[in-house]
UniProtKB/Swiss-Prot annotation:
Name of this protein: Pentatricopeptide repeat-containing protein At3g22670, mitochondrial
Transit peptide: 1-31
Cellular compartment(s): Mitochondrion
InterPro entries, sorted: Pentatricopeptide_rpt, TPR-like_helical_dom_sf
PPR repeat start-end pairs: 165-199, 202-232, 238-268, 272-306, 307-341, 342-376, 377-411, 412-446, 450-484, 485-519
């Protein structure tokens, strides 16, 4: 449980007996940085501190000048020594780190943006030993660039002593599906199926296929893949497989197709409790509460008892509508039926109350949790930190963050992402960078940075025109196998446009287009308008030409978003 020193003082203003009883909360609007975070955080290198403060460094006469000297990293052939030479000299680090195989491969993959056939030819000069772990790492780094990923995949399979496994095939299938190259995706699945002895096509393979089809709005294709997978690939169409399909359809906003599958297969594939919970969640998500209730009644008729997952779907939907009266009624109904809310339920309620600016009630949720003997988890902490930060209580948020391990709860990537966003929201740029550095020291993969980790940091760099720090962060992303996706390009293009860095925005736009990611509509218009304002006619024509040529080649580009 959380210590009284940390949590109890937060709810001492309220101490509600019912979680929705209205009280006032006295907020702490201090801007003081948490001494706990400051004391335990690792020291930042001077070259990052200089970028944040715009002070001259000991090894550079003008950081601001360097900060303007921006060259977009190609995300692979970045010359590390060029960018980090000052750090190496100042720290006396004269020993060069050997170039890792992953970096050698990435150097080749980013030499030019060409077809996957050309990538295969280029890699013929690459002298690395191919292993399964190397293949998986490369596919993670290029999960948004199917040409490079697929070219490397083909080349790797031709190397002496190496044969692709089911894991690497599935990873490549997922990349192709993510990039919506479905024809090539199916070719690869059929290639996997030729190896009858190994049985490479599994439910994991087909689940990735169905999920990617559903995500692209190809709901009928996803259903067809399920119906054909036993006959064509020997993958059993059982309850688990049906649930995988229905879950994909519901998550991608098609409860109608999921319900249709359920009705069609009801007599041939026996549903289980998860089947009903998927449908109930889908109906609640679509605000079809009568249908959700009817499904819960059918669940009971088929001798399955509604559980905490069932009720939490209703709670979440009512929370999103801001109908806390019905939320309270649902919580009471749960208890009457012998089903206590769990930490997921309480986290949803607390987060929604905080979002509705009912902060006293939100913090009061913890008291109710204690009554039920419910122990907070990492997601609960993340929500609590977010609420405290948004209400000006950043010092409390930082203390709660630091106290997590004392309470036996490990910080994960979601908690770090929330804390980084909170630090930046309160102009604690240096603390945010410390947190990013601390993530590397956490054990396990649960704290590996993801796109959401970097997004607010990149946004800060654009807003404050920290061009060199922006480059360092992009490099850091690649080193952590975080693929630059279309959303990141949009963030960069729009952020740089708003900061007057139009030339840099053009560079990112060009790179996105070369990789098949075309930010259309509002993003493109913003860039063109900014170029027009600055009388950059030549650059404007180039951007318009890029978009038009790409549109002609692929008028239905699956990666085009606004």
């Amino acid at each position: 449980m959380l210590t009284k020193l940390r949590i109890s003082k937060l709810v001492s203003y309220t101490l509600p007996r019912r979680i929705f009883q209205r009280r006032f909360l006295v907020t702490n609007n201090t801007a003081e940085e948490s001494p706990i975070v400051a004391a335990e955080s690792p020291e930042l290198p001077s070259w990052i501190k200089d970028f944040l403060s715009n002070k001259p460094s000991s090894s550079s006469s003008s950081v601001s000048k360097d900060d303007e000297d921006f060259v977009i990293p190609s995300l692979a052939n970045w010359v590390e020594s060029q960018k980090f030479s000052r750090q190496q000299v100042s720290e006396g680090n004269v020993v060069k780190k050997p170039v890792e195989d992953i970096d050698k491969v990435c150097d080749f993959l980013n030499k030019k943006d060409t077809s996957h056939e050309d990538v295969v030819k280029e890699l013929s000069k690459c002298d690395v030993v191919v292993t399964e772990s190397l293949v998986l790492q490369v596919l993670r780094r290029f999960s948004n660039g199917w040409n490079q990923a697929y070219g490397f995949f083909i080349w790797a399979n031709s190397q002496t002593g190496y044969v692709h496994s089911g894991h690497t095939y599935n990873a490549m299938v997922d990349v192709l599906g993510k990039c919506r190259n479905f024809d090539l995706m199916w070719e690869l699945v059929n290639e996997m199926n030729k190896n009858e002895e190994s049985k490479l096509v599994t439910l994991d393979t087909m689940s990735k296929v169905m999920r990617r089809l559903a995500k692209s709005g190809k709901y009928n294709k996803a259903v067809d893949a399920f119906l054909e997978m036993e006959k064509s690939y020997g993958v059993k169409t059982d309850t688990i497989a049906m649930n995988s399909l229905m879950d994909a359809l519901v998550k991608e906003n098609s409860i109608e197709h999921a319900h249709e599958v359920f009705l069609k297969l009801f007599d041939t594939i026996k549903p289980d409790a998860r089947t009903f919970n998927i449908l109930i969640h889908g109906f609640c998500k679509a605000r079809k509460f009568d249908d959700a209730r009817a499904m819960m009644d059918l669940m009971k008729v088929t001798e399955f008892t509604p559980d905490v997952v069932t009720y939490t779907s209703f709670v979440e939907a009512y929370c999103k509508e801001g109908d806390f009266r019905r939320v309270n009624e649902m919580l009471e109904e749960m208890r009457e039926n012998g089903c206590n809310p769990n930490v997921v339920t309480y986290t949803i309620v607390m987060h929604s109350l905080g979002k509705s600016k009912q902060v006293a009630e939100a913090l009061g949720v913890y008291e109710k949790m204690k009554e039920d003997g419910c122990v907070p988890d990492a997601k609960f902490y993340s929500s609590l930190i977010h609420i405290l930060s948004k209400t000006g209580r950043f010092k409390d948020a930082a203390e709660i963050f630091e106290d997590m391990t004392n309470q036996g709860v490990r910080r994960d990537v979601l908690v770090y992402n929330t804390m980084i966003s909170a630090a930046l929201h309160h102009s604690r740029d240096e603390m945010a960078l410390r947190l990013l550095k601390r993530m590397e020291d956490e054990e396990g993969e649960s704290c590996s940075p993801n796109v959401e980790t970097y997004a607010p940091l990149l946004k800060m760099c654009c807003h404050k025109k920290k061009m060199k720090l922006l480059g360092i962060l992009l490099h850091h992303m690649v080193k952590n196998d975080v693929s630059i996706d279309v959303s990141t390009y949009i963030l960069l293009i729009r952020g740089l446009c708003m900061s007057g860095k139009v030339e840099e925005a053009c560079l990112f736009f060009e790179e996105a287009v070369r990789k098949g990611m075309v930010p259309r509509d509002s993003t493109c218009k913003m860039l063109v308008d900014e170029l027009e304002k600055k009388n950059m006619a030549e650059a404007k024509l180039k951007i318009q030409s890029l978009v038009q040529s790409k549109t002609m080649i692929d008028s239905h580009s699956p990666l085009s978003v606004s």
